[in-house]
Amino acid sequence: MTARTTARARATAVSALLASSLLLVPLAGTAAAHPAAAPSPAASAPRAGGFDATALERALAEVPDGDVSAALIRVGGKGSWSGSAGVRDLRTGAPALPHARFRAGSTTKVVTAAVVLQLVAEKRVALDAPVSHYLPDLLPPSFTEPPTVRHLLTYTSGLRPGASLGSTTEEMYAHRFETLTPQEVVAASVAQGPAHDPGERQEYGNIHYTVLGMLIEAVTGDSYEHQAAVRVFRPLGMRHTGFPGGPDPRIHGPHHRAYADIGGRTTDVTEWNMSDRWAAGDMISTTADLERLVFGVFGGKVVPRALLDQMLTVPDVDGGTYGMALERFVIDGREIWGKTGSRPGYHTVLGATRDLSRTVVYSVNAKSAREDGFPLVQRFALPAFAS
């Protein structure tokens, strides 16, 4: 089983490394990290449908391990299967919750793209109009050729990464309760000038979708969060999906504790202000809701069918693997479109064939959730696309 991807795509779009040989050390400030006995995996009986349920069950049977504390998987399309394994809290050893809420990371971009494409269908936004038409004060004179809305959607805008609170999980952890606004992120980006001409090459990054969030607010006169709710979450019945609410560091409702390796110690990183990720990665969701999102996007419910072809077109540029929000893979000769998301302690994947004959969504709690994690995708997602 193979997946066509690039080293860059693996490093940026797939972000948790399976490291089962690692040993958990005591939680910072606690006496023990291991549950007394790992709960048995829970899985639904597979319905007929051409995927490797045995491999998925085997993957869950190995959870928890030295890196992964919990895993939730849903497979849909022609045949369905779901399973959960691991623990929701290393202190108590309580079993994982099949419907737990989690930080969905960059899968947020799929929602942002859907909202923008609805505005395009309403003729309130034009794909090939410069972003400065909607945000006239955004770009300084150094941008002699402003990127278009299409460039932002396809990660080809030439915008440089914006401000951040650190480049490693350990650096960011020290600032986890601080607030960095989207406006500050974007201001730091545009102050550097463009990295390249718009449309010259594709470089995945959050900055493109942070600007799109600002565009949505400028065009609608409404908050990004409310537009996402009324245009995507509510129509699709995503009742357990939303945004934390500004700098709120908590995940409200049932959820798993998240862990990362900070200074050589397994540390609880569940509470974390992620508001700087905003329209690029601040969403909280469940696997069932993300499955609804997949069916809603590919089924034409929240992305107009006339624009879905454009969403699923990879631009002919250097490094191109993404359409709008979603990345294209080929697995055993099948074209798959998907998106990963990672925040400290949380790694998420959603993927589907264009005809929805196969879908997969998973959420994994992993200490290495922000590292190159193609092995996790191989373990928890690729068996769903086995021929």
Residue ranges, per PLM feature:
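Short active-site loop at a secondary-structure junction
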Residues: 92-150, 196-205, 278
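Catalytic loop of the DD-peptidase/beta-lactamase superfamily, centered on the K-T-G motif
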Residues: 2-4, 29-84, 270-387
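N-terminal carbohydrate-binding/catalytic regions of secreted carbohydrate-active enzymes
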Residues: 72-95, 103, 110
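N-terminal low-complexity, Pro/Thr-rich disordered segments
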Residues: 9-58, 167, 171-175, 247-260, ...
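Short, surface-exposed loop or secondary-structure junction motifs
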Residues: 142-336, 340, 344
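A generic alpha-helix surface/boundary motif
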Residues: 54, 113-114, 129, 210, ...
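Residue-level preference for non-acidic, small/hydrophobic
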Residues: 60, 78, 109-112, 116, ...
